[in-house]
């Protein structure tokens, strides 16, 4: 341990109740199977409420009608959100048609939600439809295993359709990493797929009998795009190419954005550079990072249990040395890499494989049929004729990938007919993102997805007023401090504090390599817009050529940059 990080390798003390729950779960089985047959409640009881998360589900209820149901002496309208495991975000048109039909027939909302972790979610699955949902995924060659709770979650991979060979190689590694780090328990197959129970003891050689201390997120990144927001993730493999071929990875560890309001022991953190590895060591390094965090992560306090806190407690060099020891691999010096942006290239691009790729902007990732814009039907119609694949992006958009020249006009016609292509969408709207929040998320403190569209319209008005209609601010809204909307890597981030109120963070950058600092606490939409109007006015007049909004507010002293978030994230800055 270093002088800067005198903390112990293992935190001792009373374990959190989550650890009890996992240890008593019989490798994630609990009594979920019995609970499925309990018709007296629409929800899962006791430990099962949390255990189902390991199976890719969250128990939710419609918060818009919660009080009304309570007055009627009814339990909340319980329904499950189910999240698919889809490493790298690639799904076939045939698979898509299967999930499209299920969403229409078996969910309360009828929508498909593309997430910023490159997968899709069903919202509003009633308890009786949960098992059929898992069985449908299995029939389609998919599953929901380990997309939530204390495991390695869905592995992201940069959506880069132009560099087709490099993307394919990176995507294959994302799949391998995902498979390697999956739970080995047979609980998922037994409960949902009616697999035969085998009279052997489960083993979890990588994750351990009580799994990880907290959720764990992994990415494969292809510079110069940082669409996956690597600094929001525990483990990152940054692709290093030679003549267009993947040869190895720079490894970065310990990023994460989740905080808790009022708890200064929680903070966002950028990932630390560990070094370079050739391809053949990828799985060994992934496993070593995960097992080190498994053994050293804080199991007494879930708010302090993520990899970022372990690194701060023991020190980056100590953690890195342990990873090298466990993997039997020494990191080389970091290879040069640079990020230039993280937005998706909306519209058509041609790959080096001569195929065309169409990126469709899906506001908030929500596919539903709206009056005059039948988005969900449109994607299904494209799926019926498309010969390539679909790619879900970390910006919640959808790429129709691998389109031959002869099909291009037909697919564009369908996209335009159903409102999936709209030339009037502004750069600001394309670079704004929100988490789901109300009405389904139980953690929501303020609106996010439902708030964003009209809020963006008002931001567009401010940009227009100051002569910047084609400019944009990377803007994120998250309904609570858990950070699903990745607001703490935005140029302007809104973090929900209470209904109608947000903490406003400024000073991130377009590349996603700087954490924004809180500028105002607990303010209303109108207050945020007044501040934005003032600052955009200055930006329009005083900015340097091609200077982004986040870089500008730091350069002119509106706010100080976050340099070392574990120590300076909460420093109070006098606003200019």
Curated annotation (Swiss-Prot):
Siroheme binds at residue 484. PROSITE patterns: NIR_SIR. GO terms for molecular function: 4 iron, 4 sulfur cluster binding; heme binding; metal ion binding; NADP binding; sulfite reductase (ferredoxin) activity; sulfite reductase (NADPH) activity. Keywords: 4Fe-4S, Amino-acid biosynthesis, Cysteine biosynthesis, Heme, Iron, Iron-sulfur, Metal-binding, NADP, Oxidoreductase. Pathway: Sulfur metabolism; hydrogen sulfide biosynthesis; hydrogen sulfide from sulfite (NADPH route): step 1/1. It is an enzyme of class 1 (oxidoreductase). One of its GO terms (biological process) is cysteine biosynthetic process. Disulfide bonds: none annotated. It comes from the Bacteria. It catalyses: hydrogen sulfide + 3 NADP(+) + 3 H2O = sulfite + 3 NADPH + 4 H(+). InterPro entries: CysI (IPR011786), NiRdtase/SiRdtase_haem-b_fer (IPR005117), Nit/Sulf_reduc_fer-like_dom_sf (IPR036136), NO2/SO3_Rdtase_4Fe4S_dom (IPR006067), NO2/SO3_Rdtase_4Fe4S_prot (IPR045169), NO2/SO3_Rdtase_4Fe4S_sf (IPR045854), NO2/SO3_Rdtase_FeS/sirohaem_BS (IPR006066). Its EC number is 1.8.1.2. One of its GO terms (cellular component) is sulfite reductase complex (NADPH). Alpha(8)-beta(8). The alpha component is a flavoprotein, the beta component is a hemoprotein. Component of the sulfite reductase complex that catalyzes the 6-electron reduction of sulfite to sulfide. This is one of several activities required for the biosynthesis of L-cysteine from sulfate. This is Sulfite reductase [NADPH] hemoprotein beta-component. It comes from Yersinia enterocolitica serotype O:8 / biotype 1B (strain NCTC 13174 / 8081). The lineage of its organism: Bacteria, Pseudomonadati, Pseudomonadota, Gammaproteobacteria, Enterobacterales. The gene is cysI.
């Amino acid at each position: 341990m270093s002088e800067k990080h005198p903390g112990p390798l293992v935190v001792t003390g009373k374990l959190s109740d989550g650890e009890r729950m996992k240890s008593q779960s019989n490798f994630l089985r609990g009594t979920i199977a019995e609970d499925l047959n309990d018709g007296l409640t629409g929800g899962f009881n006791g430990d099962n409420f949390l255990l189902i998360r390991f199976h890719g589900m969250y128990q939710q209820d419609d918060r818009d009608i919660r009080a009304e149901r309570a007055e009627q002496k009814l339990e909340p309208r319980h329904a499950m959100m189910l999240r698919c495991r889809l490493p790298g975000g690639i799904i076939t048109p045939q698979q898509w048609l299967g999930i499209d039909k299920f969403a229409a027939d078996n969910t309360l909302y009828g929508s498909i939600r593309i997430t910023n972790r490159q997968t899709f979610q069903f919202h509003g699955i009633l308890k009786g439809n949960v098992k059929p949902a898992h069985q449908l995924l299995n029939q389609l060659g998919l599953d929901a295993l380990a997309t939530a709770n204390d495991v390695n979650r869905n592995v992201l991979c940069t959506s880069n359709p132009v560099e087709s060979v490099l993307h394919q190689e990176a995507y294959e590694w994302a799949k391998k990493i995902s498979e390697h780090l999956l739970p080995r328990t047979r609980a998922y197959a037994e409960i949902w797929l009616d697999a035969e129970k085998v009279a052997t003891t489960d083993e979890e050689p990588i994750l351990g009998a009580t799994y990880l201390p907290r959720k764990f997120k992994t990415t494969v990144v292809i510079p110069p795009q940082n669409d996956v927001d690597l600094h929001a993730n525990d483990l990152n493999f940054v692709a290093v190419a030679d003549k267009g071929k993947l040869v190895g990875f720079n490894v970065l560890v310990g990023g994460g954005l989740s905080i808790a309001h009022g708890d200064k022991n929680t903070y966002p953190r950028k990932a630390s550079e560990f070094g370079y590895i050739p391809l053949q060591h990828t799985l060994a390094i992934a496993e070593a990072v995960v097992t080190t965090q498994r053994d050293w992560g804080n199991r007494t306090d879930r708010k302090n249990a993520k990899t970022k806190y372990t690194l701060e407690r023991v020190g980056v060099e100590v953690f890195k040395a342990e990873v090298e020891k466990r993997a039997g691999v020494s990191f080389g010096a970091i290879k040069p890499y640079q990020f230039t942006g993280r937005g998706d290239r909306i519209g058509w691009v041609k790959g080096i494989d001569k195929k065309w790729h169409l990126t469709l902007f899906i506001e908030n990732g929500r596919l539903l049929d709206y009056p005059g814009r039948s988005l969900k039907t449109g994607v299904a119609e494209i799926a019926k004729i498309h010969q390539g694949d679909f790619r879900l992006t970390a910006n919640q958009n959808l790429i129709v990938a691998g389109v031959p020249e002869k099909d291009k006009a037909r697919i564009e016609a369908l996209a335009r007919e159903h409102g999936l292509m709209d030339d009037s969408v502004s750069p600001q709207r394309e670079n704004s993102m929100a988490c789901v929040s109300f009405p389904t998320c139980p953690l929501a403190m303020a609106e996010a997805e439902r708030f964003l569209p009209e809020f963006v319209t008002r931001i567009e008005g401010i940009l227009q007023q100051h002569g910047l209609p084609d400019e944009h601010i990377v803007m994120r809204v998250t309904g609570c401090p858990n950070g699903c909307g990745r607001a703490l890597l935005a140029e302007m981030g809104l973090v929900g504090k209470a209904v109608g109120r947000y903490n406003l963070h400024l000073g991130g950058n377009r590349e996603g390599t700087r954490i924004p600092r809180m500028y105002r606490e607990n303010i209303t939409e109108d207050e945020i817009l007044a501040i934005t109007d003032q600052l955009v006015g200055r930006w329009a007049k005083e900015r340097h050529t091609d200077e982004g909004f986040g870089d500008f507010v730091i350069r002119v002293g509106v706010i100080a940059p976050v340099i070392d978030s574990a120590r300076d994230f909460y420093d109070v800055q006098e606003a200019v």
